[in-house]
From Swiss-Prot:
Miscellaneous note of the record: Was identified as a high-confidence drug target.
Function: Involved in glycosylation steps downstream of mono-O-methyl-glycosyl-p-hydroxybenzoic acid derivative (p-HBAD I) and 2-O-methyl-rhamnosyl-phenolphthiocerol dimycocerosate (mycoside B) during the p-hydroxybenzoic acid derivatives (p-HBAD) and glycosylated phenolphthiocerol dimycocerosates (PGL) biosynthesis.
Upper taxonomic lineage: Bacteria, Bacillati, Actinomycetota, Actinomycetes, Mycobacteriales
Gene3D superfamilies in alphabetical order: Spore Coat Polysaccharide Biosynthesis Protein SpsA, Chain A
A GO cellular component annotation in the UniProt record: membrane
Name of the protein in question: PGL/p-HBAD biosynthesis glycosyltransferase Rv2957
Keyword Protease included in the entry's annotation: no
Enzyme Commission numbers on file: 2.4.1.-
GO molecular function term, any single one: hexosyltransferase activity
First-tier enzyme category under EC: transferase
Pfam family, one: Glycos_transf_2
Amino acid sequence: MAAPMFSIIIPTLNVAAVLPACLDSIARQTCGDFELVLVDGGSTDETLDIANIFAPNLGERLIIHRDTDQGVYDAMNRGVDLATGTWLLFLGADDSLYEADTLARVAAFIGEHEPSDLVYGDVIMRSTNFRWGGAFDLDRLLFKRNICHQAIFYRRGLFGTIGPYNLRYRVLADWDFNIRCFSNPALVTRYMHVVVASYNEFGGLSNTIVDKEFLKRLPMSTRLGIRLVIVLVRRWPKVISRAMVMRTVISWRRRR
């Protein structure tokens, strides 16, 4: 089978209750140029049975890897190693692609916006139906919050250039990875006005566990939620914003 355009990577562990809706949203895509990489950490429920129900429909496009891992980011790194697609998307088992033509719309955007290394859109928060996203830059990543990773398509080669997810961060390694991407001036990042996923905002580890190792590396303003820095940056961007961002980026690179 020729290498697909997209690899959709889903880490799983005892997710039988939510996995069917996720897999159904993938199987019904009008764009079939994808593979599904399911990385299971040793489920003891019906997770793998459910995945195999979709095997006749997906055929060779379904890759199932089962082994113990060191957490979700270790599973995601393994998914990257297994993937053959040009572009990688990571979904939680309790998330789903938003529309049947989502991949088709993303493929069209990428085709019209070359070169690109990272393209991202928006998500719909499932509990409130709120659309979250918009365009990001390094300032927004450092001083406000992260892009929802269910909305990001990474060129696979980035994981060779930038490196894998850092396993010392238990729940926010994707934020660290995005900062590394956005702080690299050689990479091209693009925002697309497309809703990529329906996102279960209460299902992630970041809502239940504090990643102290990662948070202590963020700017003080981000950690404490102080908005004064943002006001100062907006009023005197050339004096404050660039200096603060560069100090943070230099620190990030030195401490990787």
